[in-house]
């Protein structure tokens, strides 16, 4: 995990203030997915332990975060099926259960980044670099996209990082964010997921350059686990 000092971000005409947080240095790999979810659980089309996991839904990812947290400390579970936050989401059984997901801010808990956190980190955090892509204005230096990917995902960390040392933020796989597409500004605690698209950022191995720009976003159904270019990376609140 990479420390990201908080600050302010302009998203269009809206100023967002962010506290310190941490973001995964890389997208979550297939090796980490299997370590958490169990042997044989890897859903990815393009297989390889150091490739990003793909073909995961937003619901799958929320369940992964909770299971990872439970492995560390059951008290670090942060996603729940009820508004009183007493029923942890996705610790067992089917991973794509319909319903709302409620987030309880929990120090040290792994979670999905918000769209604002993702974009702020991609721009270099406090440095807010004036670049088109995460780390460069030249996309092929920092991202796997339609021009250089050989039409498949690639192992993590092979290209240049951005100013914070984060790899593959643009290209390789789209990354799920916590936020509902319809909520501006986003609700940070409750996600009524039925029929509400979620935001993905960064573009993918299949994307044209314009879709990999930091400012661009995509949205899709939270149940969708069929695309071999949907992945994610972890975030968490910063703790000393």
Stretches found by the model and what they are:
Residues 3, 8, 44-45, 52, ...:
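Conserved beta-strand positions that form and line the central face of beta-propeller blades
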Residues 2-3, 54, 111-113, 119, ...:
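Structural recognition of the beta-strand scaffold that forms the well-ordered cores
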Residues 1-42, 49-70, 170-171:
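A short glycine-rich, aromatic-capped structural motif
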Residues 160-162, 192-240:
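Disulfide-stabilized, aromatic/cysteine-rich ligand-recognition loop
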Residues 11-13, 35, 177-189:
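Cytochrome P450 core scaffold surrounding the K-helix E-X-X-R motif
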Residues 9, 48-141, 176:
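Short, well-ordered surface patches within globular domains
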Residues 96-105, 141-170, 221-222:
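Short, well-ordered junction/capping motifs at the entry into regular secondary structure
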Residues 28, 39-41, 69, 124-127, ...:
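Acidic glycine-/aspartate-rich tracts in secreted/extracellular proteins
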């Amino acid at each position: 995990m990479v420390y990201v000092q908080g600050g302010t971000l302009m998203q269009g005409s809206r100023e967002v203030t962010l506290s310190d947080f941490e973001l995964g240095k890389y997208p979550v790999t297939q090796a980490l997915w299997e370590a958490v979810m169990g042997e044989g659980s890897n859903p990815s089309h393009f297989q390889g332990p150091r490739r990003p996991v793909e073909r995961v839904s937003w619901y799958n990812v929320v369940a992964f975060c909770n299971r990872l947290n439970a492995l560390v400390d059951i008290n670090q579970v942060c996603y729940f099926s009820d508004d009183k936050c007493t029923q942890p989401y996705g610790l067992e059984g089917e991973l794509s259960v319909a319903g709302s997901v409620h987030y309880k801010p929990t120090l040290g808990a792994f979670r999905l980044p918000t769209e604002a956190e993702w974009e702020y980190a991609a721009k270099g955090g406090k440095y807010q670099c004036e670049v088109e892509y995460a780390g460069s204005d030249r996309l092929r230096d920092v991202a796997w996209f339609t021009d250089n990917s050989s039409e498949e995902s690639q192992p993590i960390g092979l290209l240049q990082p951005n100013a914070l040392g984060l790899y593959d933020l643009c290209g390789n796989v789209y990354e799920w964010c916590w936020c509902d597409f319809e909520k501006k500004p986003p609700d940070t605690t409750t996600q009524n997921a039925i029929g509400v698209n979620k935001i993905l950022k960064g573009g993918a191995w299949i994307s044209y350059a314009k879709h990999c720009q930091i400012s661009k976003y995509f949205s899709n159904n939270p149940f969708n686990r069929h695309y071999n270019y949907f992945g994610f990376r972890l975030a968490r609140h910063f703790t000393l």
